[in-house]
């Protein structure tokens, strides 16, 4: 039986940790644990229901974890469900009951180490990289048990679209990138070309009907090349010599967004070596299955710039095509032969040194799933028996998540710190602190243990790294990459907890460690006042002209975002209430510049574009909250007035808000189909309007929204999983499974205390 293991791994000599694996979440199949008939029936029903409704509800509800926790942490008291009719008033008592039902449930799915585990899947192109890398290295059967493979196949079949293809993400239309990689994954997992009740054949037909695998995106071309199912000559150049350029040049990889450079780093190593894995019978068969013409007849030079129209979110500018053609025809031949080959060898050596630095300083987790499996493959290419390769293997499990739709690869090793920091703020907002003190105490302990306590070793400039001492990461301290808004949300949560007696929530964080966190936040402000994600913006937006990833937008540099900027303002204002003299002038100046930046980037309709959540409701929540924290109000700030008008204009007939992920792609507000409301969008809009003083002007929109949230709550106190709510790089959606509980709790908590009780 499958079981979610939390904070385990101390007995494994190939696992490294800074804090005893706190926050680690791994699904493990234990054949000795059969499970009760009731549990097995619940699991099977959940799987069957998902498959039956997979084209209507494409998002899983994370039920396997919930079934496990319902047995381990049964809810002591399930209060009667509350409903509010259209003709009825929303009363404080009904809101309080709804909150207690929600908090009773949400506390029951908290892990023993204090965080809330959950699904952080969504993208369909992540797991194929893992499967291809394991297949090449010969480790597939050692790392993936038959049960792992079965669940991965379940996931791939469940998320195949009606037309036979697969999307970039679970809710997206079919793309060549998703379809080819998912098809290849099924074949490498042992599925025959005509298995899956015709599903594999339907996938192949979609690929061939849309031009074959030569039309896959550049990332897909790279994966097929290392597998041996595509030729390196059909790739645009990924020269590792970029790492030898002087840093003063704007195009140096060290100036790029860390996710971008950390993906192209191992790609450039593999390209520089022209590495190809073992040509197995399956690979030879794929050469026949994936193309519309015989493999030996393919024009690989022409294939370099081919891309299916379904995948083309960011078409290559002409300048880029000229650049790649020049490198391909004139520069690459020189670097592949002596004496130019000596420069190539030096570049490859530089690349692998940076790969090892990244591996060692993330305990072999790596910044994300794409570079995780690429780095692992590079370590194997360098030396199949290396310690580095062996240290990579057990960390693969950190990225795998199991739900009723099957096993997927997550977009990070989880969202542990991020979700926990938000959860604390949500619970505190309800003013039911004593009742849920044990929950807050565990979360408090977890947040303190997730802080990064040291900078990375060596010369940070040489390794292109920012300071990290005092920061909070998105997931775990073992991952360790510092992020501006994660650090800010960590500070905010701790400042709230510091106001509560320690007998209830435990001892607060040492002041010096808070000072370190504030130092990280201050260090991440750009000259224009905005805050990027991991590092300062190190180059220019025109670098996007050389963005080779047709599928993603705005990936080349670390841009400033409304979310990061707002979170920084909120953190610094909450901090200075308790420590008014610490770096007073720097903090004051930082907040003023940040507020000006936020006003400057507001869209003319009053909204802010959200880059990490769907989309304008998310961005506008941060916009309003940041400006209010900076001392602005509806009365003295036209930006807040315009933002409120924008949100009120988008309220649905049901009383809630419901925004489609299409907003992210099109950069125009798009309602969910049928003008449906969504509990998460509704909560974001409510929180925005409450902060902007809507209750004093006209509380009716808030009452309508609260009614929708109360009526949406499920019988057990949980809230429903609706459409996907996370996004990255403009075009790819990602799951935040905890949002469905955190934000309705937070919105109803604020509504109860600041609207109903205040009136």
Swiss-Prot record:
Q: Which Pfam families does the UniProt entry name for this protein?
A: SQHop_cyclase_C, SQHop_cyclase_N
Question: What superkingdom does the record give?
Answer: Eukaryota
List the active-site residues: 485 (proton donor)
Gene Ontology terms, cellular component aspect?
A: lipid droplet
Q: What tissues has this protein been observed in? A: Ubiquitous.
What is the top EC class of this enzyme, as a single word?
isomerase
Which stretches are PFTB repeats? Answer: 149-190, 514-559, 591-631, 640-681, 702-743
- Provide the reaction this enzyme catalyses: (S)-2,3-epoxysqualene = cycloartenol
GO biological process, any: tetracyclic triterpenoid biosynthetic process
Q: InterPro entries this protein is in?
A: SQ_cyclase_C, SQ_cyclase_N, Squalene_cyclase, Terpene_synthase_CS, Terpenoid_cyclase/PrenylTrfase
Which UniProt keyword terms apply here? Isomerase, Repeat
Q: Give the EC number(s) listed in the UniProt record.
A: 5.4.99.8
**GO terms of molecular function:** cycloartenol synthase activity
Q: What's this protein's function?
A: Oxidosqualene cyclase involved in the biosynthesis of cycloartenol.
Similarity comment: Belongs to the terpene cyclase/mutase family.
Q: What is this protein called?
A: Cycloartenol synthase
Organism this protein belongs to: Ricinus communis (Castor bean)
């Amino acid at each position: 039986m499958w079981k979610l293991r939390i904070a385990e791994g101390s007995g494994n000599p190939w696992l490294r940790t800074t804090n005893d694996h706190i926050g680690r979440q791994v699904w493990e199949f234990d054949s000795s644990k059969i499970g009760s008939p009731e549990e097995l029936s619940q699991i099977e029903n959940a799987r069957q229901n998902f498959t039956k409704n997979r084209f209507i509800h494409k998002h899983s509800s994370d039920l396997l974890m919930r079934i496990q926790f319902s047995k381990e942490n049964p809810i002591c008291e399930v209060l009667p469900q509350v409903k509010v009719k259209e003709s009825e008033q929303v009363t404080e008592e009904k809101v309080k009951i709804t909150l207690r039902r929600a908090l009773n449930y949400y506390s029951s799915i908290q892990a023993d180490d204090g965080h809330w585990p959950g699904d952080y899947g969504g993208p369909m192109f992540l797991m194929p990289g893992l499967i291809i890398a394991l297949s090449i290295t010969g480790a597939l059967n050692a790392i993936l048990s038959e049960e792992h493979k079965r669940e991965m196949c379940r996931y791939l079949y469940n998320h195949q679209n009606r037309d036979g293809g697969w999307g970039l993400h679970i809710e997206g239309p079919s793309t060549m990138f998703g379809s080819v990689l998912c098809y290849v994954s099924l074949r490498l997992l042992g599925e025959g070309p005509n298995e899956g009740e015709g599903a594999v054949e339907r996938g192949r037909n979609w690929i061939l009907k849309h031009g074959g695998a030569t039309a896959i995106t550049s990332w897909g071309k790279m994966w097929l090349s290392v597998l041996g199912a595509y030729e390196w000559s059909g790739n645009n150049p990924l020269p590792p010599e970029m790492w030898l350029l002087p840093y003063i040049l704007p195009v140096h990889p060290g100036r790029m967004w860390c996710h971008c450079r950390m993906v192209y780093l191992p790609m450039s190593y593999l390209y520089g070596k022209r590495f190809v894995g073992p040509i197995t019978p399956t690979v030879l068969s794929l050469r026949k299955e994936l193309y519309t013409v015989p493999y030996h007849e393919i024009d690989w030079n022409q294939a370099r710039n081919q891309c299916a129209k379904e995948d083309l979110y960011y078409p290559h500018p002409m300048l880029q095509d000229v650049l790649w053609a020049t490198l391909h025809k004139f520069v690459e031949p020189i670097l592949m032969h002596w004496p130019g080959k000596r420069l190539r060898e030096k570049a490859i050596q530089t690349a692998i040194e940076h790969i090892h630095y990244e591996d060692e300083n993330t305990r072999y987790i790596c910044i994300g799933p794409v570079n995780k499996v690429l780095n692992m493959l590079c370590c194997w290419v360098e030396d199949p028996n290396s310690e580095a390769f062996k240290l990579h293997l057990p960390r693969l499990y950190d990225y795998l998540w199991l739900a009723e739709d099957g096993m997927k690869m997550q977009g990070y090793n989880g969202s542990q710190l991020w979700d926990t920091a938000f959860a604390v703020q949500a619970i505190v907002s309800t003013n039911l602190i004593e009742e849920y003190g044990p929950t807050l105490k565990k979360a408090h302990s977890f947040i303190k243990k997730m802080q990064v306590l040291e900078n990375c070793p060596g010369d940070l400039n040489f390794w292109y790294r920012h300071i990290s001492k005092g920061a909070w990461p998105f997931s775990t301290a073992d991952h360790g990459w510092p992020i501006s808004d994660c650090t800010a949300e960590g500070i905010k949560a701790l400042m709230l907890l510091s106001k509560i007696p320690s007998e209830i929530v435990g001892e607060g964080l040492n002041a010096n460690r808070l000072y370190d966190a504030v130092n990280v936040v201050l260090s991440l402000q750009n000259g224009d006042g905005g805050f990027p994600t991991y590092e300062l913006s190190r180059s220019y937006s025109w670098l996007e002209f050389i963005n080779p990833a047709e599928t993603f937008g705005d990936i080349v540099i670390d841009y400033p975002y409304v979310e990061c900027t707002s979170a920084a303002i909120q953190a610094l204002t909450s901090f200075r209430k308790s420590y008014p003299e610490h770096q007073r002038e720097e903090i004051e100046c930082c907040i003023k510049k940040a507020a000006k930046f936020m006003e400057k980037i507001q869209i003319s309709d009053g909204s802010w574009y959200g880059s990490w959540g769907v989309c304008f409701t998310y961005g506008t929540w941060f916009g309003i909250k940041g400006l209010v924290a900076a001392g602005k109000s509806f009365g003295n700030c036209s930006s807040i007035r315009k933002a409120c008008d924008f949100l009120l204009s988008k309220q649905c007939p049901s009383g809630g808000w419901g925004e489609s992920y299409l907003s992210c792609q099109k950069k125009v507000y798009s309602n969910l189909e049928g003008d449906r409301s969504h509990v998460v969008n509704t909560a974001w809009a409510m929180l925005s309007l409450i902060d902007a003083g809507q209750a004093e002007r006209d509380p009716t929109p808030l009452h309508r929204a609260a009614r929708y949230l109360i009526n949406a709550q499920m019988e057990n106190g949980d809230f429903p999983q609706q459409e996907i709510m996370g996004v990255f790089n403009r075009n790819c959606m990602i799951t935040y499974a905890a949002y469905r509980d955190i934000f309705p709790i937070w919105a109803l908590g604020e509504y109860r205390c600041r609207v109903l009780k205040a009136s």
